[in-house]
UniProtKB/Swiss-Prot annotation:
Alphabetical UniProt keywords: RNA-binding
Origin superkingdom: Eukaryota
Gene3D superfamilies: 3.30.70.330, Cytoplasmic polyadenylation element-binding protein, ZZ domain
GO cellular component: cytoplasm; nucleus
Protein name: Cytoplasmic polyadenylation element-binding protein 2
Signal peptide feature range: none
Keyword presence, Transit peptide: no
A GO BP annotation: negative regulation of cytoplasmic translation
Sequence ranges assigned to domain RRM in this UniProt record: 430-512
Region feature Disordered, mapped onto this chain: 17-46, 64-98
Comp. bias regions, Acidic residues: 87-98
Source species of the chain: Caenorhabditis briggsae
Length: 566
């Protein structure tokens, strides 16, 4: 074997190990030639395909260029058309303006020519529109009141500018309603002075709320904070506060004036005797009982008698003279007669001497009374008769001496409760009792005060009595957060500042009735719990045995229970 073959065999590897190198050499040469011929054919075909695609792309480019040219031509044509239209419209507007100027000149000439030419003038098509509005306004005297409020010299004739302004304002109010402006327009004043009685009868059944806004169907108030409403037909409490009374006012004057709204009693508070209600609506206007010589001898005055602390009988001059000197003959230790007691007690602040008897107390006039009406409807009628000022509702009290301007403060039943959110449940263990709440304060005002001070307020209630549903001077505040509740009851006292109210109120845990003992009560056995431990270590209700059992430890000796009424 030649040297060249041996070298080739060594290159071929193990396939020529058995001496087959010559056959493999022939096969490899033929395969190489075939591969080269295939490559040449493939290259020729690729060149032809590239030429074809190039031609196609060239045609596509030409088509795109043609389309772009067409679009540009169309845009130019549209621009030309638009410019022509705009020019034509401007020319038409100029022509119309010239025509209007010419017609105005003709109208002025026709007015100057005389009454004969006035009859030949064409009728304005808008004149019927203005005439309809004039006829509509003629039946509404409040429109004249509105015009005269703007211009005092205005007449009954409604001019076109006013009608145009009214129409534009009406359309704007329909598109963008304004509740306050609608309320003002609804409450337009009646210009007829003599028609006051008719106006009062028409509004007799209206419901006036404490913030002087029109109530909604729930008898509540328009505010995003108010979620409460009245349950039942009543709106106001039958107990009404009347303030601003002078010292010379008499109870007979009060009864005589306010009895026009319904049967009532007068609750006259004083510093020494508390509240006395001695005028009964069932027998009012009947013959009065003869008053005794002194109110000290009357332990329980009969119903129907005017309050003995007030009398409409003026004291005799002799009585006044005796009361000034202290005795009949100028001696010492004068005995107080009926005239002297009436002067000291009825008018309040008398300067007569004190009695040497069994320590008679002199009544001091507080300047306010409470009216206890028999029906809630009477309070509504009273409120409709009042007039509004910045401080509240007022009415003119007609007395025997002179008319008196007094304040009327009704209590709206919806103001006794306030809910922050219906979705938050109320935990009875996180309810605080608020003592010393001013009576004019509403639940929503108390809620906002505690919300700003402690936060997490859920519900607020004002305690009211069962008979008249009038505030008792206390309230309840429910919290949703334990730490806020603990902070409130640990402070114990807080000063409440609201408008003209500046008073210190007491905060302590609220005790609920009919609570079961949380220490020994189970599902089938409920033990009444009269004690509640507000300490953070306990903080639960206990029955008496469990209280002694749980507080027998030295660490709980100092815990003080909360009991109802203490």
């Amino acid at each position: 074997m030649s040297k060249s073959r041996r070298v080739f065999l060594s290159i071929q590897g193990d396939d020529d190990f058995w001496g087959n190198g010559d056959q493999l050499e022939g096969k490899t040469l033929s395969s190489i030639k075939q591969q080269e011929s295939k490559k040449m054919d493939d290259s020729v075909e690729g060149m032809e395909e590239e030429k074809y695609f190039f031609r196609q792309s060239k045609l596509g480019r030409q088509n795109l260029e043609r389309l772009h040219e067409k679009e540009e031509q169309e845009c130019e044509e549209e621009r030309l058309d638009w410019s022509e239209k705009v020019d034509s419209e401007e020319e038409e507007e100029d022509i119309q303006e010239q025509d209007e100027i010419i017609t105005e000149g003709k109208e002025t000439e026709m007015f100057d020519s005389g009454p004969e030419t006035d009859q030949k003038m064409p009728v304005d098509p808008n004149e019927g529109f203005y005439n309809n509005y004039r006829s509509y306004f003629s039946g509404r005297p409040e429109m004249l009141f509105l015009i005269r409020s703007i211009d005092e010299s205005a007449t009954d004739y409604y001019e076109k500018p006013f009608i145009d302004l009214y129409e534009t304002t009406r359309k704007r109010l329909e598109m963008y309603p304004n509740t306050e402006l609608n309320q003002i327009l609804r409450c337009a004043c009646n210009p007829n002075a003599g028609g006051g009685a008719d106006y009062r009868v028409r509004n007799k059944h209206a419901v006036v709320v404490s913030n002087f806004r029109e109530p909604d169907r729930r008898l509540g108030r328009y505010s995003k904070y108010y979620y409460h409403h009245n349950v039942g037909p009543e709106v106001y409490s039958r107990k009404v506060f009347v303030g601003g009374l002078p010292a010379c006012v008499k109870e007979m004057d009060i009864l005589h004036f306010f009895s026009r709204y319904g049967r009532l009693q007068v609750d006259w508070p004083s510093k020494h005797y508390g509240c006395k209600s001695d005028s009964d609506p069932s027998v009012y206007n009947e013959p009065s009982f003869t008053p005794p010589t002194s109110h000290l001898g009357l332990s329980s005055p009969p119903f129907g008698q005017i309050n003995p602390f007030m009398t409409d009988c003026p004291p005799a001059p002799s009585d006044l003279q005796m009361s000034r000197h202290g005795s009949v003959d100028g001696g010492g230790g004068g005995f107080p007669t009926h005239g002297m007691s009436m002067r000291n007690i009825g008018f309040g602040g008398g300067s007569g001497p004190r009695s040497t008897g069994e320590g008679e107390k002199k009544q001091q006039h507080l300047g306010y009374v409470f009216l206890l009406f028999e029906k809630e409807r009477s309070v509504r009628d009273l409120v409709t008769e009042c007039f509004e000022e910045e401080e509240g509702l007022f009415i003119i009290l007609e007395s025997a001496i002179e008319p008196i301007r007094v304040q009327i403060r009704p209590w709206l039943l919806a103001d006794a409760e306030f809910l922050m959110d219906f979705n938050v449940p109320i935990n009875t263990k996180m309810v605080a009792f608020i003592g010393g709440v001013p009576r004019p304060l509403k639940a929503v005002e108390l809620a906002h005060f505690f919300e700003q001070t402690y936060g997490n307020v859920v519900c607020v209630g004002i305690d009211i009595d069962n008979k008249f549903k009038y505030p008792r001077g206390s309230g309840r505040v429910a919290f949703s957060n334990y730490h806020a509740y603990v902070q409130a009851i640990t402070d114990r006292y807080i000063v409440l500042d609201h408008e003209d109210i500046h008073k210190r109120v007491e905060i302590k845990p609220y005790f609920f009735h009919n609570q079961s003992c949380e220490e020994c009560s189970s599902r089938y056995h409920r033990q009444y719990a009269p004690f509640f431990c507000p300490s953070l270590e306990c903080f639960q209700y206990y029955c008496e045995p469990c209280w002694h059992k749980m507080h027998a430890r030295p660490s709980r000796f100092h815990h003080m229970p909360v009991v109802k009424g203490i």
